[in-house]
């Protein structure tokens, strides 16, 4: 029995955000990063490089595609299922393309009490994201029909005193009540 191909193992559905991310092609920069990480571990522990390599891929490619899983597995001498286990275990790894502007809304206690759930509802309403298709395990990211915006809940973003807080890509925003959602989105018009 042969091993399943990663595309058979991974649910990487195309989303409207896919148009903002080119297909995965290993770059010279990725090869150099993988080589740098691999020399940090003894030969019998090369699999330890999987996390830093996956973080690099997601940072540069937006998400971890089936092709990226396959490349990582081949580069580390692993079966693709071993890489998929890591990708599917950690909620920070995305298996489908987010929007051009990815919004992470803190949902821990201070932010929840400050209105982060209402903020999430308002962001979804303004961007046309269907919250009923989002869940905390398999599809935590909702993508707008135009592909420009995506939203997901995040655990603590470490600014409890200025709740509710969110991040848009790498930009941090404090005190973003639901009634400020429209102003927030206006800053990120494509």
What are these regions (language model features)?
Residues 2-190:
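Signature of N-terminal electron-transfer/Fe-S-associated modules in redox systems
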């Amino acid at each position: 029995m042969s091993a399943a191909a990663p595309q058979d193992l991974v649910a990487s559905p195309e989303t409207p955000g896919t148009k903002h991310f080119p297909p995965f092609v290993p770059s010279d920069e990725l090869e150099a990063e993988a080589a740098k990480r691999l020399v940090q571990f003894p030969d019998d522990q090369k699999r330890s490089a999987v996390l830093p390599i996956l973080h690099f891929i997601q940072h540069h490619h937006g998400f971890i595609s089936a092709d990226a899983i396959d490349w990582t597995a081949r580069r580390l001498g692993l079966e693709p299922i071993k890489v998929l286990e890591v990708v599917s275990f950690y909620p920070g790894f995305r298996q489908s393309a987010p929007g051009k502007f990815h919004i992470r809304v803190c949902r821990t206690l201070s932010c929840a009490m400050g209105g982060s759930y209402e903020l999430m509802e308002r962001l979804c309403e303004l961007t046309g994201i269907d919250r009923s298709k989002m869940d905390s395990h398999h599809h935590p990211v909702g993508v707008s029909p135009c592909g420009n915006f995506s939203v997901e809940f995040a655990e603590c973003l470490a600014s409890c005193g200025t709740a509710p807080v969110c991040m848009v890509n790498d930009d941090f925003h404090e005190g973003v009540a639901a009634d400020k959602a429209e102003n927030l989105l206006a800053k990120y018009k494509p």
